[in-house]
């Protein structure tokens, strides 16, 4: 739901600040990125029972499984973002043609927001387990507020690219950085920080269970 609101905010503000054409350019790239967004929901949903079942009986195993879910989703997002970044021009030309060449840079920026989208899925699952549901709404509101502010600053100067950067930064702030400022959910920040260490990805491959 939060992702849909972000997209609506971006497109409304783009229309008002940069014109209708920029909305089409932006939407073309965004549609390609959102195709992947159900993936973390499905993965987290399938692994969620194995995490919650050990919460009250084996805290070390609970943390280990939770950390592996963070790592799996975040590095899965990296695995999607890297090739799409390099193949963005080919993808846009094949799917939309030369008329949408301006969507290439949007795709290259916006695809990296997927890392924080994937991260937010596991964050939200963790907050539900810990009975911190109110922080799901709070962090979403913080992310959306920062998105609006950044759109106001960036769109007049950079158009659709500015909106893409605004989304990337606000996702990062709402799904990652802002968790540090709330003691009850600060553990989510540290889970994510550990996940962003490249060693975590290799460790998951070596010890997947």
Language-model regions: role of each:
Residues 63, 111-139:
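Membrane-interface junctions at transmembrane-helix termini in multi-pass inner-membrane proteins
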Residues 1-49, 113, 117-121:
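Transmembrane helical elements of multi-pass membrane transporters/channels
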Residues 20, 85-115:
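Interfacial segments at transmembrane-helix termini and the short loops linking adjacent helices
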Residues 4, 31-34, 81, 114, ...:
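Residue-level recognition of pore/gate-forming positions within transmembrane alpha-helices
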Residues 21, 93, 134, 141-176, ...:
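Membrane-interface helix-loop junctions in multi-pass transport and translocation proteins
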Residues 179-209:
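Membrane-proximal transmembrane or re-entrant/amphipathic helices at the cytosolic face
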Residues 27, 59-75, 79-87, 104-107:
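Interfacial transmembrane-helix starts/ends
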Residues 33-59, 63, 126-129:
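Helix-loop junctions and terminal segments of transmembrane helices
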């Amino acid at each position: 739901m939060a992702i849909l609101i972000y997209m609506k905010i971006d497109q409304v503000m783009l229309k008002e600040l940069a014109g209708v054409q920029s909305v089409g350019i932006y939407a073309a790239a965004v549609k390609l990125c959102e195709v992947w967004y159900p993936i973390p929901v499905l993965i987290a949903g399938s692994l969620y029972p194995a995490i919650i079942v050990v919460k009250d009986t084996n805290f070390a195993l609970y943390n280990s499984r939770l950390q592996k879910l963070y790592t799996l989703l975040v590095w899965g997002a990296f695995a999607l973002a890297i090739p799409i970044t390099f193949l963005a021009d080919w993808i846009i030309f094949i799917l939309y043609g030369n008329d949408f060449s301006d969507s290439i840079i949007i795709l290259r920026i916006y695809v990296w927001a997927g890392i924080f989208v994937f991260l937010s899925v596991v964050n939200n699952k963790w907050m539900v387990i810990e009975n911190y549901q109110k922080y799901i709404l709070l962090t979403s509101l913080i992310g959306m507020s920062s998105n609006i502010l950044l759109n106001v600053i960036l769109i007049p100067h950079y158009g659709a690219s500015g909106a893409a950067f605004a989304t990337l930064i606000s996702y990062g702030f709402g799904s990652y950085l802002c968790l540090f400022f709330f003691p009850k959910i600060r553990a989510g920040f540290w889970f994510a920080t550990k996940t962003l260490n490249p060693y975590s990805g290799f460790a998951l491959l070596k010890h997947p269970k």
